[in-house]
């Protein structure tokens, strides 16, 4: 019997199965909170920059609803995982090829890239403060945190997103936590049980 703890499976991104596929099929479409937060409504499908691409799930969902999505990821390892996942989804063909055809992946720091992109809508989902009961945090998110760190520049990123967006910036954050000090007050919020979207309007759409 080995004295070593079991190895955690390597981080893997897959847009064609599991939770991502379930959310695409049964998540509620444009009625769900994320879609409403970015401004989707009948006849309106904004172009979106996901400034913190991470595992790409929000980007994939938004693209599945018809949006053109530009993902920005600065971490080398996560960027490589995303590129691989996009390629595999494209190779899967059918609806997956159509969806990832609306997704573009950029490698770089969103704070510097956002002013060059002139985005209508910017989505920001920075690494959140660790929860008090860390054992309850999904192993996958612990892996992501171990790779990307804590996003110590999150206030600068949110500020840059608000400044760059021509219509709205959206910050995804735990429902019961206040935004970091230094972030302005949102125009409005869309809150669920565990997640809140703080919306900063730049232009009434």
Model-predicted segments: where are they?
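Residues at the starts of beta-strands that form the adenosine-phosphate
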Residues: 47, 68, 102, 167-168
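Conserved proline-anchored active-site loop of SAM-dependent methyltransferases
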Residues: 48-61, 119-138
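Mobile active-site "lid"/loop adjacent to the S-adenosyl-L-methionine
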Residues: 126-157
